[in-house]
Structure formats: C-alpha cells, structure tokens
C-alpha cells in the first residue's frame, strides 16, 4: 500500500475541518514559519515518536516542499502507522498560495 498524498491546495479545507498537521522540518525552520496549528516533530526524531502519529483520524505530514515529509510517511507506514498523509508542495507551496503562516516555537 502506498502513502496517500494531498496537494497544498487541499490543506486549507483540511485545516478548517480540524485536521492534525505535523511538521517534520528542523526547529529553526519551524520557528520561521509554519502552518497554523502544526505540531513540530523534526524528521530525525520521528523514529522515537511513532506513537505521536497513531491517531484515529488522518495525520497530515508537512515539510518545506514534500521530500522529508514523504520520507517520514514512508517510515511511519513501514512501522504500521497507515493513517499518515504527505502534503506535496509543503510549507513553501502553502505560503505561495497566499496562505498565512505562524511564527515562533509552538503553534
């Protein structure tokens, strides 16, 4: 089974419905700007935080452009967490649409 993927165009609708977004970029990248409400779990810590992704509803994983988030999704999928969805285009694509980003440590 392959990892599900959505475009940044779909993310606003998902956020409006209360979707959970996990940002796997490094802390300094997250602080510079992230999707409103996103939870920061850097890619290097994903293997130690698998349980944070086990939720009854889909978890949308984002990074800068979609590469690191896809790696995180593939790892999680292989670890049995199948409700993860990659956000293709990432934070850069989301911002390019004119969508607002938050800054600071935690959403």
Model-flagged regions — what are they?
Residues 1-20, 26-58, 67-107:
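Rhodanese-like catalytic fold shared by cysteine-dependent sulfurtransferases
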Residues 62:
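Short, surface-exposed ligand- or partner-binding patches at beta-edge/loop junctions that are enriched
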């Amino acid at each position: 089974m392959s990892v599900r993927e959505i475009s940044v165009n779909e993310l606003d609708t998902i956020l409006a419905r209360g979707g959970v977004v996990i940002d796997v970029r490094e802390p300094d990248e997250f602080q510079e700007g992230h999707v409103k409400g996103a939870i920061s779990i850097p890619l290097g810590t994903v293997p130690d935080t698998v349980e944070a992704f086990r939720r009854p509803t889909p978890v949308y994983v984002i990074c800068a452009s979609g590469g690191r988030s896809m790696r995180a999704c593939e790892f999680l999928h292989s670890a049995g967490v199948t409700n993860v969805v990659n956000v293709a285009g990432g934070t850069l694509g989301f911002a390019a649409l004119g969508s607002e980003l938050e800054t600071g440590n935690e959403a």
